[in-house]
């Protein structure tokens, strides 16, 4: 059985920068049996990142829409896992105001990190928390999930303006604050196929180029990605092939090879 101490040891072995910014995507089930359950996992992450900033996604895109347009910052549950839902309710954690792609943060500069997401009409705008991850040279850790859960890649596609990823029209959504104030947020939504299902294609290139490495957190595989080098690599790849994630086929070997030794 895993304990808080053993999970803290795992984070040290993964060489996560305690003083930096860490965003975590997760599958609690994949971690295995933990003394104290999900709360112990969050205790370990929070304690380890106490000098820095810990961020978890608290998305609501699966059910906030034109028919159900109101996102309640305090009450709307996260649709991306039990750890994210428990985390957003913890003391000291603050949640951003984006109606579909909110994040929750704890620690250094948390309020500044989440500020202003409601000003953007897209899911992962460059000026939002998703872009601030790059500004802060953040680390992204995927616990028991693969690159298909890496929302940051959606952001890179958005910043490059890959065609066919977002609706041309806006859906009228609202964010409702603790005091009942409603903020109108007309929003462009992700559209077409579930493009993130294709993000697995770049795993081998990520590993061989040093953008990502794999370790262990509990029973789970932990993929650890650097946002700066990941962004540079994806910019190179998408500039040559804007349709990189438009199909679910493995990368052409010759295409992939040119990025293995690229200077990032």
Language-model features: locations:
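Amphipathic alpha-helical segments in well-structured domains
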Residues: 4, 38-42, 80
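N-terminal active-site beta-alpha-beta segment that forms phosphate/nucleotide-binding
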Residues: 15-69
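N-terminal basic/disordered segments at the start of proteins
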Residues: 3-10
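Histidine-centered active-site/metal-ligand motif
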Residues: 25, 154-155
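Gly/Ser/Thr-rich active-site loops/lids in small-molecule metabolic enzymes
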Residues: 159-186
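Acidic/aromatic/glycine-rich contiguous surface patches that form carbohydrate-binding/processing clefts
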Residues: 187-264
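Short, solvent-exposed amphipathic alpha-helical segments in soluble enzyme
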Residues: 39-41, 155-161
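Internal, conserved structured core segments that host functional sites
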Residues: 65-154
